[in-house]
Amino acid sequence: MSKKCVVVAGGTGGHIFPGIAVADYLKQQGWQVSWIGTPDRMEATVVPKHNIDINFINVKGVRGNGIKRLIKAPFMVLNAILQARKVLKSEKPDVVLAMGGYVTGPTGIAAKSLGIPLVIHEQNAIAGMSNKWLAKFANRVLAAFPSAFATGQAELVGNPVRESVANIAVREVSSPINILVVGGSLGAQVLNTTLPAAFAELGNTNAISVWHQTGKGHLGSVEAAYKSHKFSTENTKVAEFIDDIDTAYGWADIVICRSGALTVSEIATAGKMAVFVPFPHAVDDHQTANAQYLVVANGALLMPQGQFNQQSIVALLSPYLAKPSLIKEMAANAKQQAILDATASVAMHCEQVTNKRA
């Protein structure tokens, strides 16, 4: 009889897509897999597209959402725990794998109360509130970055990323230098408004090509900015969203982007030089901590959003464009920090805790 895993993750792609990667891997190994999420967030539409059955519980974030929700929080969480217990009693999993998001707290508690082994995985360099609590009683605590938990509390396994990212061929840096700009699916206005002028100044003394993801609703203004700075369509590609990010990574010599956990792990896995511009309003400033994992290894550059302007980006990139071997060196350093077997490692830990239960 095959084993069964319930994956718990929700809210953002940074939690959901690593969970899907592990779910797909477990299914290939003969496991049955289902999911617990919330009905009003990304997982509700994304998970079913991957042929994974999903059950829903009702829970919302408490932190930073006002006094009314804080007062109601104990009742909401208790109700969510009861809903999760009902789902788990029906699903009868051998293990629960919690990958982050508000949904993991109540479901992790429900798993513990039912004696179901619990494995948690933290994608960010600073653990979220739910995982900090669940780590106190989880059967196995896994982390993508060494700084997420206290020394000795977690197993370092990396972030599960798509296998296709690891297969991206090493590009020989040559003229023109290819610069990829990715601000997330919604874009990042600081990148959209600053970089066309900065690239124009850099392009006066260096041959560069640009592929810029603007995010929804910003295509026209960014295209106009590049045209105003005399960029031709031959060396500039602007899109609201890049569907094939693997091709974009393969094309790029330098990536300018936010530093969400999955992005940092993908950059390392692809072996690319990055300039990280952390989202300044991330909880606990975890995007800066994520970026530091590569920065301290001389595998990436960091530019705080408050310092991000035309002059600073020109000063930052000019030495690398003038000496492309520095780009190659930084990309190689990033690749050395990648943990390439993260998906298999997470699956292995799920297997191990179920074996101990048998």
From Swiss-Prot:
Keywords: Cell cycle, Cell division, Cell inner membrane, Cell membrane, Cell shape, Cell wall biogenesis/degradation, Glycosyltransferase, Membrane, Peptidoglycan synthesis, Transferase. GO terms for cellular component: plasma membrane. Its EC number is 2.4.1.227. Pathway: Cell wall biogenesis; peptidoglycan biosynthesis. One of its GO terms (biological process) is cell wall organization. It comes from the Bacteria. Pfam families: Glyco_tran_28_C, Glyco_transf_28. CDD domains: GT28_MurG (cd03785). One of its GO terms (molecular function) is undecaprenyldiphospho-muramoylpentapeptide beta-N-acetylglucosaminyltransferase activity. It is found in: Cell inner membrane. UDP-N-acetyl-alpha-D-glucosamine binds at residues 12-14, 124, 162, 185, 242, 261-266, 287. It catalyses: di-trans,octa-cis-undecaprenyl diphospho-N-acetyl-alpha-D-muramoyl-L-alanyl-D-glutamyl-meso-2,6-diaminopimeloyl-D-alanyl-D-alanine + UDP-N-acetyl-alpha-D-glucosamine = di-trans,octa-cis-undecaprenyl diphospho-[N-acetyl-alpha-D-glucosaminyl-(1->4)]-N-acetyl-alpha-D-muramoyl-L-alanyl-D-glutamyl-meso-2,6-diaminopimeloyl-D-alanyl-D-alanine + UDP + H(+). It is a peripheral membrane protein. InterPro entries: GlcNAc_MurG, Glyco_trans_28_C, GlycoTrans_28_N. NCBIfam families: murG. Belongs to the glycosyltransferase 28 family. MurG subfamily. Cell wall formation. Catalyzes the transfer of a GlcNAc subunit on undecaprenyl-pyrophosphoryl-MurNAc-pentapeptide (lipid intermediate I) to form undecaprenyl-pyrophosphoryl-MurNAc-(pentapeptide)GlcNAc (lipid intermediate II). This is UDP-N-acetylglucosamine--N-acetylmuramyl-(pentapeptide) pyrophosphoryl-undecaprenol N-acetylglucosamine transferase. It comes from Pseudoalteromonas translucida (strain TAC 125).
